[in-house]
Amino acid sequence: MRFHWIPTLTVLLVLSMSFGTEAIPXXXXXXXXXXXXXXXXXXXXXXXSEVLECYFECGNWEGTCCDTGICVGIHNCKIPEN
């Protein structure tokens, strides 16, 4: 009974991993895969980070993005001047 917590931990890990991947809908899973691939590209090209951040944070091209900016057009980030 001394090492009883090891198998329970492994089972919990496997269950959490399986639920974490299957809890997301199939459509979102495909988007997440694309986002992950593009995120790697974003990390590589940090020069145009603002536009990529706007695209990823907006999601639907319109709305709040870039922390305080607004997504305009396809993925153009405009930060309102206060």
UniProtKB/Swiss-Prot annotation:
Residues 24-48 form a propeptide. GO terms for molecular function: ion channel regulator activity; toxin activity. Coiled coil: none annotated. The cysteine framework is VI/VII (C-C-CC-C-C). Keywords: Disulfide bond, Ion channel impairing toxin, Knottin, Neurotoxin, Secreted, Signal, Toxin. The keyword Disulfide bond applies. This is Turripeptide Lol6.1. Residues 1-23 form the signal peptide. Expressed by the venom duct. It comes from Iotyrris olangoensis (Sea snail). Transmembrane segments: none annotated. Acts as a neurotoxin by inhibiting an ion channel. Disulfide bonds join 54-66, 58-71, 65-77. One of its GO terms (cellular component) is extracellular region. It is found in: Secreted. The keyword Endoplasmic reticulum does not apply.
